[in-house]
Amino acid sequence: MNTLTNKLKEKAKKLNKTIILPETEDERILRATEKIINEGIAKIALVGNEKEIKERAAKIGVSLEGAIFYNPDSCATIDAMSELLKKRREKKGMTFETAKAILMSDPRYFAAMLVHQGRVDGMVAGSSSPTAHVLRAAIHVIGPRQGLKTVSSSFVMITNTPEFGDNGTFVYSDGGVIPDPTAMQLADIAISAAEKARFTAGIKEPKVAFLSFSTKGSADGVSVSKVREAIEILKVRNVDFDFDGELQLDAAIVPEVAAAKAPNSKVAGQANVLIFPDLDSGNIGYKLTQRLAKAKALGPLIQGLARPVHDLSRGCSVEDIVEVVAITAVESEM
């Protein structure tokens, strides 16, 4: 087992958090629930009719002993929850009736509301729905955390090259949410990614590099200007981590290249958090690292929300779900 994921599971066990899984029609969710409960990683809440879910589980040989159930159809607080959702979306024209219909019909919204109310500690979804559906529920119900306007994502990349990053571990961001971030959004993404590095990846000293095809003025362009503006924004935001840019990838992570291209940088040559200028480069970058370097990729991990919600790939395995639940439990302490 990977050392980092093992550490996350052990940390989650000590926290005893409750994580809600709304997509109970997926048998992988049921199998993961059994495994998580048996291993003591977290308490699990499921959305739906308890009898029906347990019957589905029994058909595949799964016990849900110890699971908690929340059924929208019999929820005594559904009206209060609906009123709260209406208030959060009132400026967008949402009525009480519409809010209640959404909570009754979409388990992701219902689960997100339980997270927002603090009745559970976090949500994991996406095994049977697109990322956009999970994000929509999280943003509409929970919203960005104080001080941020941007909800984005990151990947924790665990490589076999300990000479780079933090003993081979990196955080890549954003590789899953914002197609063409503004300079302000890039600054938000950097703040969230640095937090992800500390709490999830175990990187004690995040060193954040804003990546580009240019290093310190070696070239110009619209995307380069955006990165430079993000750096200036971050300088006045009183952050507690080192950052620099614009840097080419080799200047960011290779000490010899950094010495030649950015000799006065506190980050160049030792970056462990990589901020990509757009979603194209971020998504391509993590997949290149995953496939060609045979790195383990944890994510996409949603960041910037007031309370933790994480998305699953629709191709996820049971073990993937277990790992993301552990991450969500740990991040509920952020």
Task: State the predicted function of each range.
Residues M1-A268, V273-M334:
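Anion-binding alpha/beta catalytic cores of soluble intermediary-metabolism enzymes, centered on
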